[in-house]
Amino acid sequence: MTSNNPAVFLLMVNGQIESADFPEYDDLYCKYCFVYGHDWAPTSGLEEGISQITSKGRLSQSLVWNFPLDITFKSTNPFGWPQIVVSVYGPDTFGNDVVRGYGAVHIPFTPGKHTKTIPMFVPESTSRLQKFTSWLMGRRPEFTDPKVVAQGEGREVTRVRSQGFVTLQFNIVTKDMKKLGYDTTSTEHSPAGLTRASQQL
């Protein structure tokens, strides 16, 4: 293939997991991973990571990580557009590390700088006895694979509770999407911005 007829397009993502708001908790850290479709492949960067532990300041209720993100994907089509899954952990009353929140968001479609705030949630026990037992044993309900957060299967039967927010900042660059017929320019009429150029007259 020549450079005039590319077979793939590139999505370059960098930015940071900036901060979190969990009013009831302190001394938290986060893990992240990317979830993407079968036609997508990472070409450089890290697919997953774990941050440092952060504490609230005297005058601030925010937990600041400023944890860097940097990854590049290649794909032949936008189906299965990458999502980032963030899991937040911290100590409970007994000093055990327990999950404080899960959340996911799609990587922005349009090039440029974007800020996203993810509402976080935690799975809950289905009965009071299970709640008491899990609190006593220090084993709260959690997903065995956090990537399930970005997928729909089985989510409708999971009992969850909203808890906190995480803010991420993205810098997005795309390459060769226009050459493959995809327009990612932001317009007022299509906020997602991901439409076939051939459909626009």
Curated annotation (Swiss-Prot):
Q: Which family would the database say this protein is a member of?
A: Belongs to the B9D family.
GO cellular component entries: centrosome; ciliary basal body; ciliary transition zone; cytoplasm; MKS complex
* Keyword set, alphabetical order: Cell projection, Cilium biogenesis/degradation, Cytoplasm, Cytoskeleton
The answer on whether this UniProt entry bears the keyword Zinc reads no
State the Gene Ontology BP annotations: cilium assembly; smoothened signaling pathway
Q: PROSITE patterns attached here?
A: C2_B9
Locate the transmembrane regions by residue number.
Answer: none
InterPro entries attached to this UniProt entry: C2_B9-type_dom (IPR010796)
C2 B9-type domain location is: 9-126
List the PANTHER family hit by this protein, alphabetically: B9 DOMAIN-CONTAINING, B9 DOMAIN-CONTAINING PROTEIN 1
* Record's protein name: B9 domain-containing protein 1
What gene is it encoded by?
b9d1
Species this chain originates from: Danio rerio (Zebrafish)
Subunit text: Part of the tectonic-like complex (also named B9 complex).
Give the molecular function GO annotations: hedgehog receptor activity
Q: What is its main location?
A: cytoplasm
Function in brief: Component of the tectonic-like complex, a complex localized at the transition zone of primary cilia and acting as a barrier that prevents diffusion of transmembrane proteins between the cilia and plasma membranes. Required for ciliogenesis and sonic hedgehog/SHH signaling.
**Cell compartments where the protein resides:** Cytoplasm, Cytoskeleton, Cilium basal body
Alphabetized Pfam families for the sequence:
B9-C2 (PF07162)
